[in-house]
Amino acid sequence: MEKIYVKIYELSGLEDKDNFSCYIKIYWQNKKYKSCILQKNPYKFNEIFLLPIDIKNNVKDEKNNILSIEVWSSGILNNNKIAYTFFELDHIRRERISSEKINLIDVVKKCTLQISVHIINNNQDILFCNIKDIFGNNKNDKEIHDAILKYGGNERHIIKELRKEKEIGQYNNIYFNDYVNVLNTDPSQNYIYNDMPKITPNNIYNNMNNDQTNHTYLKAPNSLYNNENTIYSSNVHYSTYMNNSPTYKNSNNMNHVTNMYASNDLHNSNHFKPHSNAYSTINYDNNNYIYPQNHTNIYNRASPGSDQTLYFSPCNQKKALLIGINYYGTKYELNGCTNDTLRMKDLLVTKYKFYDSSNNIVRLIDNEANPNYRPTRRNILSALMWLTRDNKPGDILFFLFSGHGSQEKDHNHIEKDGYNESILPSDFETEGVIIDDELHKYLIQPLNEGVKLIAVVDSCNSGSSIDLAYKYKLKSKKWKEDKNPFHVICDVTQFSGCKDKEVSYEVNTGQIAPGGSLVTAMVQILKNNMNTPSIITYEYLLHNIHAHVKQHSNQTVTFMSSQKFNMNRLFDFEHIIKNKNNQLGQIINKYIEKNKSKNKNKLKHELKNLFFF
């Protein structure tokens, strides 16, 4: 069936003083389509609409069918049409519109809308349109079609061919930045923990007949917990199992020795005690407070309810990775995930002073023209590497995933319910999912002490999707440690849309553009308290998110952390508390042989195939 493929890029041409909220309305064959609402200029929508063509095949019907695109302002009391344009269907067939700036017919204001409008029949046509939008008139249709036929729909290779480059280079109007530079870089070796568990591309674990698994052994210093100021150099005697372990230095000149030992044989492996492998440049006072070199602790007291030292760096960086996947054109299609990334980005920039720069905030959405910024499995893992690269004490990181989540069987026998939680990239049907062990490996394990990460995962089965050690029970107001926790050295918290065995829903009240239940609630609560940040504690935020979500669905918002802390701690992007875990790495208390209940086992498999959100 034919469809009109409409891509809305950016609204421009308005004056700086016209800083009102805007959205796009599209009218086609007695149906109305609406974009998300953007709150300030410039208005970069980057949204795609697929409009079915349902008419008789004659010229009269072609001319009588009008595609209308309107720009509206959003106000408290009413909405107003600002400008519009329209196209007859036969005009769309005759003259393709590829990423062109259209001067709209003004009603209130003069403005320009950058759009693409094409007729498509299949996914190959969409691929052609996306590539045509990138190259414009620099490549003719035949060159693009030939490249598509040559590489069988592999967009990355097609663009390489058309640009005659050895590596993916600069696209139209898109410049190289740190994220793009990471794309073809292998993960750096982790100097704090060994990889746990071993990750293979297809999530297949070998030699499982004897319940074998991988171990992670602690290589962080004892001196973090005993007031010693030890220097660990290349001349220090290694234990037997560390004979061949290299020493790495990070950006703060801290020496770390990598333990390369990891056994797949449970019967022959031993649990080693941590060795004195101290940070050579960290000093401790008599109260065991840490003062990293070149960083200043400017506070004379800790965050409310906390007895721990706070980190602050005068040159700290704030970075955010925002992933929203609507799975366009599939049976799993969602409506509000890309909206979630826009809302969260606006909140981070306006309230929490993140720089609105591609070197500080990266968005991966599936309607992005540049294939580097689409949420494929490869791009997501590369983006996680970008987010955590060169992190240092005082850095603040934020991670958002909005999309589908599922569960995969845990062949390592570590998960309490027997399943790994996972997120679904846009190409999960061909490239596979990303399980929680991988998210932990790429997102959590690379983080140094004194680094803060706040993660928000709005998807099904997301409760423990990044494998943090502690879960906060809102009803009892108590922390509970995971059965087999992985303790880390950084300061990490996670808000999840639901428990591991639940589904998470979208909210579409008609008052605002659709979005995930968790993100919609979180953004609304934080924006309502824009001028009173001192009252937003973790307890306050979690309680209000929970109440807001329960108004629309029966899912249970989950909160987890890398360490226990007083929930009266302020929710902000400034204070970083010292991690007090006295053990690091994977702690195996009990291997899970099987699920306790066949009914639970059956429920997990049923939930695995649910894709409500």
UniProtKB/Swiss-Prot annotation:
Keyword Protease: yes
Keyword Zinc-finger on entry: no
InterPro entries: C2_dom, C2_domain_sf, Caspase-like_dom_sf, Metacaspase, Pept_C14_caspase
GO biological process, one term: apoptotic process
Ways its activity is controlled: Activated by Ca(2+).
Disulphides: none
GO terms, molecular function: calcium-dependent cysteine-type endopeptidase activity; cysteine-type endopeptidase activity
Positions annotated as active site in the UniProt record: 404, 460
Residue stretches spanning the membrane: none
Keywords: Apoptosis, Hydrolase, Protease, Thiol protease, Zymogen
Assigned EC number: 3.4.22.-
Record GO cellular component, one term: cytoplasm
Family per record: Belongs to the peptidase C14B family.
Subunit structure: Monomer.
Function: Cysteine protease that cleaves specifically after arginine or lysine residues. May play a role in apoptosis.
Record's protein name: Metacaspase-1
Species lineage: Eukaryota, Sar, Alveolata, Apicomplexa, Aconoidasida
